[in-house]
Swiss-Prot record:
Post-translational modifications: Phosphorylated.
Function: Plays a role in the initiation of viral DNA replication. A dimer of E2 interacts with a dimer of E1 in order to improve specificity of E1 DNA binding activity. Once the complex recognizes and binds DNA at specific sites, the E2 dimer is removed from DNA. E2 also regulates viral transcription through binding to the E2RE response element (5'-ACCNNNNNNGGT-3') present in multiple copies in the regulatory regions of the viral genome. Activates or represses transcription depending on E2RE's position with regards to proximal promoter elements including the TATA-box.
Gene Ontology BP terms: DNA replication; DNA-templated transcription; regulation of DNA replication; viral DNA genome replication
Chain's gene name: E2
Protein name in UniProt: Regulatory protein E2
Organism per entry: Human papillomavirus 3
Biased composition (Polar residues): 218-228, 261-270
Subunit text: Binds DNA as homodimer. Interacts with protein E1; this interaction greatly increases E1 DNA-binding activity. Interacts with protein L1; this interaction enhances E2-dependent replication and transcription activation. Interacts with protein L2; this interaction inhibits E2 transcriptional activity but not DNA replication function E2. Interacts with protein E7; this interaction inhibits E7 oncogenic activity. Interacts with host TAF1; this interaction modulates E2-dependent transcriptional regulation. Interacts with host BRD4; this interaction mediates E2 transcriptional activation function.
Biased composition annotated in UniProt, kind: Low complexity: 248-260
Signal peptide (residue range): none
Family: Belongs to the papillomaviridae E2 protein family.
Main location: host cell
Amino acid sequence: METLANRLDVCQDKILELYEKDSDKLEDQIMHWQLMRLEQALLYKARECGLTHIGHQVVPPLSVTKAKARSAIEVHVSLQQLQHSAHAQDPWTLRDTSREMWDTVPKKCWKKRGLTVEVRYDGDENKAMCYVQWREIIVQNYTDDNWVKVAGLVSHEGLYYMHEGQKTFYVKFKDDARVYGDTGTWDVHVGGKVIHHDSFDPVSSTREIPAPGPLYACTTQAPTQAQVGASEGPEQKRQRLETVYGEQQQQQQQQQQQQQHTQTPAPQTTERARQPLDTDRTRDRDTTCPHPIGHRSDPDCVPVIHLRGDPNCLKCFRYRLNKGKNKLYSRTSSTWRWSCESENQCAYVTIWYTSYGQREAFLSTVKVPPGIQVILGHMSMFT
């Protein structure tokens, strides 16, 4: 046992000497990993003999030393093969030949001269992610197992390199756009240059507008049209909405004319009946009827949507909006209910917009969770 402890001490002393030497030669890095293999082999043997401590050092379990030994063997053999290539005389430091560098994407190869690439999802600085573009990537050929150096490249699609006529991506920004972004667009900032999103296919977007409930309460065809519009582009959707609004406005005007012909109230009664139409209360209750075009001439009227659903779902959705979507609307209300509907468990959240274009941009960008009903409307503006 003393011989095993002495051999372990000598091995670890040599490892410390290499750390202090801080060499940039490949031979020293190969020696370092050879000593790492020897250290794990000695610890494995000590554990097999029933030792849990060697001096003040704890002997790891067999599974731990076995895994570390395999890792050291993999890197050691790779560096030995690299020594027979044309890049053996290049500077190689402990950092360049570390296990962490070996496992960093692209994996199972050696990388040098990293350059930071910043990707801003949705064009927002708050949603920026940083990646590393390796300008020198040493990969192994598929045919002769020889190590060759290729250049790391960047495009709007991701980070990649060309090897043996094949383009190999090791980072695709599209995958992270589903996690960090909302619109499926991003800008790449590298070396003082910006690569913009020049082609966006709305079909491949990860954001859609579900229609769990009727978006328009005044007609029976509007929910079906809203569902079909989820796959349309913003310009087509805007034109379709304006067409629906115009048809609904004409229907409402015809109904009002028929009511005026069938009912002939006295002048005073007619004047009294018209006065409540300009009150805030009537506008609040009229938000279920989507005819905002008829109110665009009123400077005190603003577009809104009412979200109806479970109170907890509404609170969570409002919290997410305040964190990442606050530029798409003016303000949001607290969770509220109608006092006359005590048995109804549904609640409401009202969202205000500065313009109808902002509301359309919100609906085409934000994905409303299932179970929350969206009701378009308009309200009098107050502060």
